[in-house]
């Protein structure tokens, strides 16, 4: 019996020990699972303003780095207040490779896991400090030295008041870009305008104590410079507003979208000083409305896929240039001799448009001539109107000629660039990054907005956003309907029209892997 009782006792102990062991293993399993899903992040920014830049500098330009690390994956998001990542502006063509190489050397992070986006800032963004590579590495280093566990949240805001489409669609089926390099067409020739992307994509990273570490926000629109000041553009003002209204030390990183044909409103306004600050404040406030409604969660997976795809180079430059030169010749032949010069045209034009019924004198003189059976003033008016119409026709022809001349020059530059490459395709790096529910896909060009809207509509992820000007620069990437339109984007492009479908299909394929 003693043996029997002892056996029972041991059996109970064994069961108890097994239960404890099972609970311990369950706890360990949960701990490991949680750890694998726990994201760590560090963020920093470094001033890259060029002190020698001309003009009145009212605020600073920055390079900002966000280092992300999960159990098996590391990634870095870098944003630069510059016009482009190589190609144009003061960031050299080897900037991307130099930064990635140093990151690999110092942190051991795969170069393909580094995403660098330029805000496409004009003005000061064309001429940042000369040691921008070193300062970029400094920002990454500082961010990596201050990594903390973070909660992750994603969402979107809405801002449709500060941008408009760059291209005017004309009644003749052509396109005309709103630019300071050329005048706008007559109002009666304009049929419609294209779309914008009002969505503000947001990634929110909070520390475990509830304080916000970083806000990544994505928006679409050219940040042109103000007329009298050199600033960070609307992204600079929006970032400043976000940082001041979040936890102390929060850093806001702006990621430029597909804004190849999206510009700020009132871009050609001649009656007021162009100022980016009101636009930035509106964007910042709209972003804050969305940020406050995002509730970060403890887990957030980190994935990044980088691929290089081959896209066809454009081959119709000669045809396009010949077509524009033919149009030039036709416009030249349309010019007519005229009695007026600008000195006589301007007062006549004003006079005959304000006082249409009696432009040459007070009405009683016209009435007196009628009583006398004469029509001298009417004949004078008819002659003056013919002169005005002829002069106006010459002006419109001159405006179109100057635009054609500029576009022909652009097309010839891109033709030379493609021919010197010596191959029919161009290698393009694209990325897809997923942080929690935040998904970002990239392209290294000034992509037309419709392409981004298409990608968002087809994505299986709710919070999918697009970044142009990322990891390189190959000029413009118009949407398929803009090829042959005659707009600025049509001529400043290295790619064949097939590029859009190839890219969109590839992105759809990559998104399925995320």
Model feature map: region roles:
Residues 37-251, 255-281, 291, 298-514:
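Conserved beta-alpha junction segments in alpha/beta enzyme cores
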Residues 32-36:
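Signal peptide processing junction and immediate N-terminal pro/mature segment
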Residues 284:
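Charged, flexible cofactor/metal-binding loops and thiol motifs
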Residues 3-6, 29, 111, 209:
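Residue-level detector of alpha-helix boundary/anchor positions
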Residues 1-14:
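N-terminal secretory signal peptides that target proteins for export/translocation
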Residues 18-31:
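Bacterial N-terminal signal peptides
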């Amino acid at each position: 019996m003693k043996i029997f009782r002892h056996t029972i006792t041991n059996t109970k102990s064994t069961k108890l020990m097994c239960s404890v062991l099972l609970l311990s293993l369950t706890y360990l399993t949960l701990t490991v699972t949680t750890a694998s899903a726990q994201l760590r992040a560090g963020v920093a920014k470094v001033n890259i303003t060029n002190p020698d830049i001309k003009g009145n500098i009212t605020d600073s330009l920055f390079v900002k780095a966000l280092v992300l690390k999960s159990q098996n994956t590391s990634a870095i998001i870098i944003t630069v207040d510059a016009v482009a990542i190589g190609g144009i502006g003061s960031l050299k063509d080897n900037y991307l490779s130099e930064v990635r190489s140093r990151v690999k050397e110092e942190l051991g992070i795969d170069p393909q896991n580094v995403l660098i986006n330029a805000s496409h800032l004009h003005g000061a963004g064309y001429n940042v400090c000369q040691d921008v590579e070193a300062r970029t590495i400094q920002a990454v280093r500082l961010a990596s030295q201050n990594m903390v566990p973070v909660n992750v949240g994603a969402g979107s805001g809405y801002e449709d008041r500060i941008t408009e489409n760059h291209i005017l669609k004309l009644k003749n089926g052509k396109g005309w870009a709103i630019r300071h390099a050329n005048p706008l067409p007559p109002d009666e020739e304009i049929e419609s305008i294209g779309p914008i992307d009002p969505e503000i994509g947001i990634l929110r990273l909070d520390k475990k104590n509830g304080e916000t570490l970083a806000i990544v926000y994505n928006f679409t629109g050219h940040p042109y410079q103000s007329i009298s000041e050199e600033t960070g553009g609307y992204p600079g003002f929006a970032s400043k507003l976000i940082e001041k209204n979040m936890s102390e030390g929060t850093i806001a990183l702006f990621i430029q979208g597909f804004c190849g044909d999206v510009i700020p409103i009132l871009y050609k306004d001649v009656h007021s000083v162009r100022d980016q600050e009101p636009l930035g404040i509106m964007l910042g406030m709209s972003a804050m409305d969305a940020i406050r409604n995002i509730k970060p969660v403890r887990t957030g997976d980190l994935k990044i896929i980088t691929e290089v795809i081959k896209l066809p180079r454009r081959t119709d430059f000669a045809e396009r240039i010949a077509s524009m030169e033919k149009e030039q010749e036709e416009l030249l032949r349309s010019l007519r001799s005229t009695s007026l010069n600008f000195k006589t045209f301007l007062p006549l034009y004003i006079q005959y448009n304000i006082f249409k019924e009696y432009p040459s004198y007070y009405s009683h003189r016209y009435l007196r001539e009628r009583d006398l059976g004469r029509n001298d003033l009417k004949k004078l008016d008819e002659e003056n109107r013919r002169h005005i119409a002829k002069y106006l026709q010459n002006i419109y022809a001159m405006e179109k000629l100057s635009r054609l001349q500029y576009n022909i020059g652009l097309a010839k530059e891109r033709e030379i660039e493609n021919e010197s490459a010596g191959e029919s395709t161009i290698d393009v790096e694209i990325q897809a990054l997923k942080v929690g529910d935040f998904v970002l896909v990239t392209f290294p060009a000034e992509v037309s907005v419709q392409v981004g809207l298409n990608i968002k509509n087809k994505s299986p992820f709710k919070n999918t956003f697009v970044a142009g000007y990322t990891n390189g620069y190959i000029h413009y990437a118009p949407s398929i309907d803009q090829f042959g339109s005659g707009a600025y984007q049509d001529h400043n492009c290295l790619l064949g029209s097939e590029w859009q479908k190839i890219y969109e299909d590839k992105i759809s394929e990559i998104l399925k892997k995320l």
